[in-house]
Design a protein with these regions (language model features):
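Feature recognizes metal-dependent phosphohydrolase scaffolds
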Residues: 1-178
Length: 178
């Protein structure tokens, strides 16, 4: 939430936060695909819409979605999608520790991985935050973001050698690549 706590979200009449929120959202997403009960299936589909667009969605993380405005409105101020406060707090190692603890994780080899968050390398922003506890793995795969980020994205690779963060430069053409 805006004060550094876990936001409380009402899911069908009951408040959830932290890991419990992610658990209940996952349960409903599975119901959207697998439930034989039409009402439970519909609730699951509604939850999928919620996690795609809602301000306190752990997957979306912005105050509003402005897709309509980007296509149909000229006023640039209406197109802004402000990140929720998580993205400021997560820069602090003590907050990253709080999130990790909520999931029963601790130690020097645990990480929070966030995706689909443009990293503005041109402005000096790093995809690694909170002394290495947080890693942002998307820096601009989408061509539309590249002029703002200065990069074509990051990929986190995990193999027998460990974790590797790879930066991708924009692909210009087959001729320049060869």
């Amino acid at each position: 939430d805006d004060y550094g706590g876990f936001a409380k979200v009402n899911v069908y009449g009951r408040l959830y936060s932290g890991k419990a929120l992610l658990d209940v959202l996952e349960t409903y997403v599975r119901k959207a695909f697998f439930s034989d009960d039409p009402l439970e299936k519909e609730k699951g589909v509604d939850i999928m819409w919620y996690i795609w667009t809602a301000p306190y969605s752990p997957l979306y993380g912005r105050k509003k979605m402005s897709t309509f405005e980007r296509y149909f409105v000229d006023d640039e101020t209406l197109k802004t999608e402000t990140k929720n406060s998580y993205y400021e707090y997560i820069k602090k190692p003590e907050y990253a520790d709080k999130v990790l603890k909520e999931f029963g994780l601790h130690g020097s080899r645990v990480h929070i991985i966030n995706g689909h968050v443009p990293v503005h390398r041109m402005k000096g922003e790093s995809p690694v935050k909170s002394n290495g506890k947080v890693i942002m793995i998307d820096g601009g795969f989408s061509k539309a973001y590249r002029r703002r980020t200065g990069i074509a994205g990051y990929t986190l690779i995990y193999n027998s050698y460990g974790l590797t963060l790879t930066a991708h430069e924009p692909f210009e053409s087959p001729e320049t690549a060869v």
